[in-house]
């Protein structure tokens, strides 16, 4: 029997939602509420292929949820709120407390709140959504799905920093990794496409958007990933620096007069593609400028691809080989230029990719390797909402 599952991603001033029919994984409706707490909040919903946009003053997340539920009934999506069988909430940071998705109770709420120091921009916002939904839909099961959970299978040798061990024990300082829901989805989808048990696959997942992370997935489990204690670590991103020498922070402070918080802001919001190019954090803009012969745009593109390229080599070594490379998220799914730069020169490890096929693939699921290639290369559009809905369904005791 089909179940209706709500997949929710709550930000500090936004609420993204999808209502999904499971197990068919059919999107019934989806939408976004923006500018919550501000004047002229925008509510957008897609029903039967039509996009409907309304402007309201929405004071808080509770009011946003009420408007969303009323809209479902108004547009005939549901007859009653009790048609919804369960709700899955994206939560950015689960720390070591949550190695998997969990039913939300008052105690779980407190634990999520206790992890806010690890994700001060995200966990409090995620909690606002959780509390609003639990208040308005108290009879419906609510499940927290954590970005970090998928990476909790990493062994200590992968997640531990070479710092005094007591820092890990006392303060939880370690690599956590992010984009776990996306990496989990595409790894499972790759196994389905190949018709092979995921337990037999060594897979490198490249989630490349404005934020980007690479994951080594061995037998369906994350064994390493590029992001670290925060999403700042790893590869070059739209505005984030990725890995740098930590000694640069006091050096930059001394040279610029900035304090630590200001330097951290620079690393998070003024670096990456934006910092190198000096013009944009959007890969599409960078590619356009590079085609026009602008040297710094070309340099930004080269650095961006080079960092991903290095992680692929590193993770192939980590798993003693690789069977599948997956490209996903906005850039990974749509930029044949970035994919080509990342894959260039990987023939030595069994990656034979078809340049013409690669150029033709934008935002669709497809192989871009030659048939004889030992390593398969697949573009897979991510679907974190479906992965969230699957986790809710997997609890198995929905009404």
From Swiss-Prot:
InterPro entries: Ac/propionate_kinase, Aliphatic_acid_kin_short-chain, Aliphatic_acid_kinase_CS, ATPase_NBD. The active site is at residue 147. Its cofactor is Mg(2+); Mn(2+). One of its GO terms (molecular function) is magnesium ion binding. Keywords: ATP-binding, Cytoplasm, Kinase, Magnesium, Metal-binding, Nucleotide-binding, Transferase. One of its GO terms (cellular component) is cytoplasm. Gene3D superfamilies: 3.30.420.40. One of its GO terms (biological process) is acetate metabolic process. It comes from the Bacteria. ATP binds at residues 16, 207-211, 282-284, 330-334. Mg(2+) binds at residues 9, 384. It holds the Pfam family Acetate_kinase. Substrate binds at residue 90. Belongs to the acetokinase family. PANTHER family: ACETATE KINASE (PTHR21060), ACETATE KINASE-RELATED (PTHR21060:SF15). This is Acetate kinase. The lineage of its organism: Bacteria, Bacillati, Bacillota, Bacilli, Bacillales. The gene is ackA.
